[in-house]
Regions:
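Positively charged n-region of N-terminal signal peptides that target proteins for export
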Residues: 1-4
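Beta-propeller folds
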Residues: 7-372, 376-386, 394-398, 403, ...
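Short, solvent-exposed loop/turn and secondary-structure capping segments
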Residues: 56, 104, 111-112, 163-165, ...
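Secondary-structure transition/capping motifs at alpha-helix termini
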Residues: 119-121, 159-161, 171-174, 192, ...
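Cap/lid segment of the alpha/beta-hydrolase catalytic domain
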Residues: 130-143, 156-161, 175, 206, ...
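Generic beta-strand/beta-sheet core signal
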Residues: 169, 200, 219, 254-255, ...
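Active-site lining segments that contact anionic ligands and/or coordinate catalytic metals
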Residues: 248-249, 261, 287, 294-295, ...
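Active-site-proximal cap/loop segments of hydrolase catalytic domains
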Residues: 498-689
Length: 689
């Protein structure tokens, strides 16, 4: 490949200016299913090439300079830090014998895991990722106490990668063990008593290689990894799987490569021989497993779209018994199984509540969340029959409550070490509502809208419209102090719950996946038109944002209707659908997007693929395209190619910025507090401009 000169241009718009790089084209084509596609920027996929690295550096120099200027102008970082200091922490979670939570001790280092034996005790540090890894660019991504809390297994993510390591700590002497497990990807940790752990290993040899196969291994505490026992192998089937241990059994749920069929297995683990019984064979009904208790398999049935709880005996499946029926139009978000109770969490158009039942299905009590807040159950005290719950919302960090199941009493909880703080703003300072708008095919699409109460909605409000809309994911309020300042300054926030997500049940997901993926994008475009029509904003004040699958949606919406948006921010977006099966985990997402080896599905994917729907004669909105160099879930060259193609057109006058996070992965720069604040400040400053 010949070296090239970067050509810099200076572009001026009403708000943004940019030094622009003209990226060379190298003629290249991709052929599938009798369809040939021109792909002149495929050379940017070679991330190890110095030429690509130099190109990324120049792109970053330009975007960093502009973002630094905007951050200085709008000073979001000061308010973010101020609001963070005044925010209340949630209750610790109880796992086994101890209570756990995270604290940031040093602003330039990762969070530290703390523990306490009793809720009224002073928390003590347990795992500091920096001490373990001697690197500030590392995150503690999960922790798993053994059955009797003798050991703690924890996952470390270096440099943001999905490829992680598992390490261990001894609770008795508080020392780290020598055991280290590597090549861990998309794995939990399941204990066999205090003896050892099960984990999933990925056999990829190259960083961005197409995911090959996964194997389940058993590691005995004290052994080196090379001695670990292979328990379950998908090398021949190329399937994926999840696993967990329950009451001396190891359960494995295997999903076929095309994601249409599941097999369920279990094995006893006492003698470590691991002989599996296939107790559900070739299931295509898409059961949603909730729990397995005393050999009863609790699940939500696909034919009840809003969610129910049924069960059967894994040793003798003669029929399914419905325990808790579906509540139509109230989404069953999840279920917590206690010794004597099943606690169902429901979402009724942004109003959350818990419904408590016994194991006969009998209704016991209902608790409604205050102020339309979401909640997490942190632990249950069997002695007092009390639930300890943290409530939270987009604008309130946390309210900690104890709820008595017997009496229905509920009170704010605090002690010497867990003190409530006044909310930053009165509960009625911001108005949060979930309403619906009509899609172009006359569907009712939920949308969350937040703004200061009493603000004049005159069609001229700076507005941020966000989306995810994929994989049946159910969105939840995310407390964000950058968003708080944006709202306090007069901004409007909206989140569109488009088809493809799971906010209106299982059918809602089906209506936005595969050949119907275009519905997700159309619903999002219709949300923008709704906000403009109802005088929340106008195209010169509307910014859109989405990450991962949401990055695809906003990229596709921009190429479909560039006239609707002033600013577009795509984060870690899957923007080149033709390459879905070429790299990392894409081969496991055919059910969501389509199979590129099927002509009809491939044509559907190309019809909305942001990279392939860029037109030569359109001046697209100002863009900030964000990715991370170590994102091995959605590789960064999706964003590289999209940015290069947008920039390299004569008609493009609005600036296109590419920001590549260094030593970071799919979640961005989250390894330290200062990096997180910088990331938030840049984001909100960019859309405010």
């Amino acid at each position: 490949m010949t070296r090239f000169l970067f050509l810099f241009l200076f572009v001026i718009t009403s708000a943004f200016s940019q030094q622009k790089i003209e990226t060379k084209k190298v003629s290249s084509t991709l052929s599938k299913n009798g369809i040939t596609i021109q792909d002149d920027y495929s050379w940017l996929e070679n991330t190890s090439d110095k030429e690509v690295a130099d190109w990324v550096t120049l792109q970053n120099n330009i975007s960093e300079e502009k973002l630094a200027e905007l951050v200085k102008n709008y000073n979001f970082s000061f308010k973010i830090k101020d609001y963070d200091y005044l925010s209340t922490n949630g209750l610790p979670s109880k796992k086994g014998k101890y209570f756990y939570n995270f604290y940031r001790i040093e602003k330039n280092k990762p969070s530290v895991l703390y523990y306490r034996e009793n809720l009224n005790d002073l928390a003590k540090p347990l795992v500091d990722p920096f001490d373990v890894y001697k690197d500030a660019n590392v995150v503690l991504s999960g922790y798993f106490p053994s059955k009797n809390s003798r050991y703690l297994a924890f996952k470390i993510s270096p440099n943001g990668s999905d490829r992680q390591e598992i390490k261990f700590k001894d609770f008795a002497n508080k020392k780290y063990l020598d055991d280290v497990l590597t090549d861990i990807k998309f794995s939990n940790v399941a204990w066999n008593d205090d003896k050892g752990v099960f984990y999933k290993k990925n056999s990829n040899k190259e960083f961005f290689a197409k995911d090959s196969t996964y194997q389940l291994y058993y590691h005995k505490i004290g052994d080196i990894q090379s001695k670990d026992q292979l328990v379950f192998d998908t090398s021949n089937t190329k399937s994926n799987f999840s696993f967990f241990t329950k009451q001396n059994k190891l359960f494995v749920v295997e999903t076929s490569e095309d994601e249409t069929t599941k097999n369920y297995y279990y094995s006893t683990i006492e003698n470590e021989s691991f002989q599996f019984k296939n107790f559900i064979k070739d299931d295509k009904s898409n059961l949603e497993l909730l729990n397995i208790i005393n050999d009863k398999f609790y699940f939500s049935d696909e034919k009840y779209s809003w969610g129910n709880i049924s069960y059967f005996d894994i040793n003798n499946r003669t029929e399914n018994t419905i325990l808790i029926p579906q509540v139509y139009s109230h989404l069953l978000v999840g279920a917590t199984f206690l010794e004597n109770y099943i606690i169902c969490k429901y979402d009724n158009m942004g109003k959350y509540y818990m419904s408590i039942h016994d194991y006969t299905g009998k209704f016991i009590r209902k608790f409604e969340a205050p102020h339309n807040m979401d909640f997490q159950i942190r632990f249950y005290d069997e002695k007092t029959n009390e639930l300890f719950v943290t409530f939270y919302s987009y604008t309130i960090s946390s309210l900690n409550y104890k709820l008595n199941i017997t009496t229905g009493a509920n009170d704010i909880y605090f002690n010497d070490f867990i003190q409530p703080k006044p909310t930053l703003f009165p509960f009625n300072y911001f108005e949060t509502k979930t309403i619906t708008y009509k899609s172009r095919d006359n569907k009712d699409i939920p949308i969350v809208i937040i703004h200061k109460k009493g603000i004049e909605l005159n069609g001229n409000n700076p507005t941020l419209l966000r989306v995810y809309g994929g994989f049946g994911s159910v969105s939840s309020p995310n407390y964000d102090t950058g968003l708080l300042h944006f709202l306090e300054k007069g901004g409007v926030y909206a989140f569109a719950k488009v088809r493809g997500g799971g906010e209106k049940g299982k059918n809602w997901h089906k209506e936005g996946k595969g050949l119907k993926k275009i519905n997700s994008i159309n619903d999002f475009v219709d949300a923008a038109e709704f906000l403009i029509r109802e005088k929340y904003t106008n195209p010169n004040k509307l910014a859109i944002n989405g990450g991962s699958h949401g990055g695809l949606v906003v990229g596709a919406a921009m190429t479909q209707r560039p006239d609707l948006f002033k600013v577009v921010i795509s984060e870690m977006g899957r923007l080149d659908m033709a390459s879905l099966d070429k790299y990392t985990s894409g081969i496991h997402h055919f059910d969501e997007y389509g199979n590129p080896n099927n002509k009809e599905e491939f044509e559907s994917m190309l019809s909305y693929s942001p990279y392939h729907t860029i037109k030569e004669d359109v001046n697209y909105p100002t863009c900030l395209i964000i990715t991370s160099e170590n994102d091995d879930r959605v590789p960064p060259f999706h964003s590289y190619k999209f940015a290069a193609k947008l920039q390299n057109r004569k008609k493009q006058k609005n600036p296109i910025y590419l920001k590549v996070n260094k030593v970071a992965g799919h979640s961005g720069n989250i390894s330290s507090y200062e990096k997180r604040v910088k990331q938030q400040s840049e984001f909100y400053s960019f859309i405010w401009e």
